[in-house]
Amino acid sequence: MFPSWSTTFVLCMGLCSLMNGALAQYDEGASIEDFEFRSACTTANNVCERMADTCCPGLQCIGCNPLDPDDDGHCSCQ
């Protein structure tokens, strides 16, 4: 049948405490250098330079066409 409300509550609280512990361990591993890097890699309006690696990890500086004479070299992090 269905578990009682008290059993459901205890299971939920147990899972919540496990998740909080996992998040705390993740945060302990992050250093101030990691935080500074993540802050520094955020670009204004997702604009990046073609020749500079300013996008955050997981994003690429794309949207430029170096063969286009009207291309100003500004791309977007996507």
Curated annotation (Swiss-Prot):
Superkingdom: Eukaryota
Tagged with keyword Signal: yes
Presence of the UniProt keyword Secreted in the record: yes
Keywords: Disulfide bond, Secreted, Signal, Toxin
Protein name listed in UniProt: U-scoloptoxin(13)-Er1a
Organism field: Ethmostigmus rubripes (Giant centipede)
GO-annotated cellular components: extracellular region
Single GO term (MF): toxin activity
Cellular compartments annotated: Secreted
Primary site of residence: secreted
Summary of the tissues where the protein is detected: Expressed by the venom gland.
Family: Belongs to the scoloptoxin-13 family.
PTM characteristics: Contains 4 disulfide bonds.
Signal peptide stretch: 1-24
